[in-house]
Amino acid sequence: MRGGMAITAALVVVAAAAESRWAELGREITYDGRALVVSGARRMFFSGDMHYARSTPEMWPKLIAKAKNGGLDVIQTYVFWNVHEPIQGQYNFEGRYDLVKFIREIQAQGLYVSLRIGPFVEAEWKYGGFPFWLHDVPSITFRSDNEPFKQHMQNFVTKIVTMMKHEGLYYPQGGPIIISQIENEYQMIEPAFGASGPRYVRWAAAMAVGLQTGVPWMMCKQNDAPDPVINTCNGLICGETFVGPNSPNKPALWTENWTSRSNGQNNSAFSYPIYGNDTKLRAPEDIAFAVALFIARKKGSFVSYYMYHGGTNFGRFAASYVTTSYYDGAPLDEYDFKCVAFLVNFDQHNTPKVEFRNISLELAPKSISVLSDCRNVVFETAKVNAQHGSRTANAVQSLNDINNWKAFIEPVPQDLSKSTYTGNQLFEQLTTTKDETDYLWYIVSYKNRASDGNQIAHLYVKSLAHILHAFVNNEYVGSVHGSHDGPRNIVLNTHMSLKEGDNTISLLSVMVGSPDSGAYMERRTFGIQTVGIQQGQQPMHLLNNDLWGYQVGLFGEKDSIYTQEGTNSVRWMDINNLIYHPLTWYKTTFSTPPGNDAVTLNLTSMGKGEVWVNGESIGRYWVSFKAPSGQPSQSLYHIPRGFLTPKDNLLVLVEEMGGDPLQITVNTMSVTTVCGNVDEFSVPPLQSRGKVPKVRIWCQGGNRISSIEFASYGNPVGDCRSFRIGSCHAESSESVVKQSCIGRRGCSIPVMAAKFGGDPCPGIQKSLLVVADCR
């Protein structure tokens, strides 16, 4: 205990010394029990998470500008160790991994940065952000009071902090970084490490503070974060679940306000997109309620929407079963909460009338009304004036010309003597592949004697990988796959025909991402565990200890046949008479669609594999794994325009399960339908106080409003997804809206009776619902 107190005291001394030095420079950031204090002024911050490695440098300026226009003050990002140090001691800060360039772009647009260094990040990211070489460090135990781990963690954190200092990116230096994070959600696994857990927390905090960045440090979901490190909340409803700061001198910060929720029974669970599942986005009203409650109940002063821009898990960086498309949450406008009264109604069904300081108010179900100066309602969470838009994928190029496609059938390894490794045991997969490929071949020879009787046998394989494909004597015999929420092991039990004499069994074990969380992650095992053959009534013959050969990766991967140079290293065939079957590479070319709309591939006709454009992997696909809705978890795959050339773009896919490439289309994405729904008692934005509520709609990408699909001033039924005229309707609704909007990029229509020629139904609360098309 005394040792822990000494460390805490040392932290405070170091932090105080740093604050004194930075204060002399005229720029200082500290905190008190209410908020972060920037150059002497308390600030309330609204932040959005945006990961530089999940987009491209060409996209960053526009994404950041949209975040700023959406009302954000701060962009929050993780730092991904495994992209920056993929090989020990060899660093990469180029292209989409140029962290400094990303932060400078944020600064150029006048926003602040929350830098989550981790270096464990989870983030549904490969190996939780750790480089796999860390797994092979002798005697290492991740995220514990373990000297090998602490040394490597300190080296990387110091590398990042030193880089930020050298570039002058911390706020006291004139930069945008106002806060940093060390570790991430460690409390969830801390008990697994016993006494080592708290010691590690104290060490991590001391190490971070000792780097003297001049800005506060925080730990997410870490109630025992030592002073001066701030403990923060991650979750859906931090206004209800957060225990609060562990010191009266620390502010309440919400570092992850999740913008999607679980489809299951646990309403407070985070739901990120995984293969085989549907994802449920949160309604803006629900997010607004949660934010207002956090501010009212916990005195919150920092909220970050996770995610504000989701982006793409390029290449193989998605964690286990996580889709290539990382989700986008709906951003909310910023509201200047200089309010002193929050009236909360937790009832989800009733609208009570309340008296507050001689003011009579109705509180909508599950809502919070924010009163400025305890008198004027400036914000109601049940009435979020957010525009809704519907994205449309427009097929602009069909890749259905059979003459433009070529195929290469991936060879199934048959010869043990040509294996990468051999051994009389079943190897663990990630240790063998170093997580540099999803694929590991297990090859064994089985001698079948005539005396064994029936040539039809059963092949039994149990595996801790995610997918298994089995071949016997070069013939495909079956596959099996798991799921994110299912049992860890998968089992293949299938018939096979054996010939007399030697038979070659080739098993392709496939990982769909590596783990990203959990205690003792370095000890997790994957790959095939048991292989057996049963013939007739004979006992199962286990092959676990036979001589096995191993081939790491696919042949096409080794030769990089997805690149312009590598594509010439194999003999491609026409697909005129090709019967689609597992493990086939396909290639073609396509032209870049004109314009600036986002470009995607529609891979609905395919099965499972990976796709490259001009040598750049745009990620794994798995459209054959349907969600409960019956639809693929993801069918459209984003191609950043920065990956493209004007024409002759090389498209290469490796298909594991079959699929028809002739049905693939190149699409552009655009918001073709926009909608606004505001009632006459909605609170206008603070900057418009005193004015009447308005429906505001606008088209993106230079498009203009071409038609009005629906307009009703009265009591329209439904919302932006489903709507019809109600019992009260102004006949002039459509003509008024058309006159205000047609041919324009955007328009605003006051929600007031005079605009529509008078009150169509006195005594009834009215709203205006408008649905418009953009072209």
Curated annotation (Swiss-Prot):
One of its GO terms (molecular function) is carbohydrate binding. Residues 1-17 form the signal peptide. Residues 689-775 form the SUEL-type lectin domain. It is found in: Secreted, Extracellular space, Apoplast. It is an enzyme of class 3 (hydrolase). One of its GO terms (cellular component) is vacuole. Keywords: Apoplast, Glycoprotein, Glycosidase, Hydrolase, Secreted, Signal. The active site is at E185 (proton donor), E256 (nucleophile). It catalyses: Hydrolysis of terminal non-reducing beta-D-galactose residues in beta-D-galactosides. One of its GO terms (biological process) is galactose catabolic process. Pfam families: BetaGal_gal-bd, GHD, Glyco_hydro_35, SUEL_Lectin. PROSITE patterns: GLYCOSYL_HYDROL_F35, SUEL_LECTIN. Its main location: secreted. Its EC number is 3.2.1.23. Transmembrane segments: none annotated. The keyword Transferase does not apply. Glycans are attached at N257, N266, N277, N358, N602. It comes from the Eukaryota. Belongs to the glycosyl hydrolase 35 family. This is Beta-galactosidase 7. It comes from Oryza sativa subsp. japonica (Rice).
